[in-house]
């Protein structure tokens, strides 16, 4: 029961790391270990073993706590970066929403402008102009339109349009111009309204058909005026009787032109007794003055003077 054990015994409760309160040189004969002493030593050894066994667990807990703090720090960094990215996305979204609202506002303004009366008026004017270009503005003739051809070029279309417009304009002018009788053309020495008759027959007929001496209109066949008095000859506006004879030369004051007497000759309208005394030439400029009593023809001669011919009105 009273077994003596040294402090260095490995089977002792304290083990190798146990602090022995006695010296190892103490012999068993000198030490009297009672039961109470052994119990007290054994209890103290248990307490020391418990404290030594709890040491490594505390270090592991500290290591785990450090790792958790590091992980929390890294997670906080990631969270802050995600928060900043989210904020940037929110700012971009706000900008896009503002731009979208501005585009909607501009679209509404454009719709209001297109629906305004000004644009509608312009559209109507454009339709009218296109309609006028499609149809003739001179003489509308639906039968004269050329059918559309898919293989026609723009140049041919433009030429065809010019030809159509020219033809319609010519037709309108031909319809609006009055019909000139043949005896009037022969009197003026013309083949037609736009052509001068230079044939010998026309010249001969104008020169040879002189009025008779007893004809009432024989005194009005021709009167020669110098260039200095040409303005006086063309200033007759109402009747030949208003033309003053004071502006004529002294050699021509006795001319019947100064005080004409109007008579109605008994000749047919197709006769040429009262025609020009000279023929017409391409370089001659003929001016016609119409009066209630008849017509006056004034033209420039080759010497620079003026030829005046009075044609009384013929009775029907």
UniProtKB/Swiss-Prot annotation:
Q: What GO terms are given for molecular function?
A: chromatin binding
Summed up, the tissue specificity of this protein is: Expressed in most tissues. Enriched in proliferating cells from skin and gut.
Principal localisation? nucleus
- One GO term of the biological process aspect: negative regulation of DNA replication
- Stretches of Polar residues bias are at 134-155, 207-234, 253-262
Localization recorded for this chain is: Nucleus
Upon changing residue 264 to A, the result is: Abolishes phosphorylation by cdk2
- Describe what happens upon changing residue 239 to A: Abolishes phosphorylation by cdk2
Write out the coiled-coil annotation as residue ranges: 82-117
Q: Which family does it belong to?
A: Belongs to the GEMC1 family.
Subunit structure of this chain's protein: Interacts with topbp1. Interacts with Cdc45l and the kinase cdk2-cyclin-E (the interaction is direct).
General function of this protein:
Regulator of DNA replication. Promotes initiation of chromosomal DNA replication by mediating topbp1- and cdk2-dependent recruitment of cdc45l onto replication origins.
| Annotated protein name in UniProt | Geminin coiled-coil domain-containing protein 1
Gene encoding it? gmnc
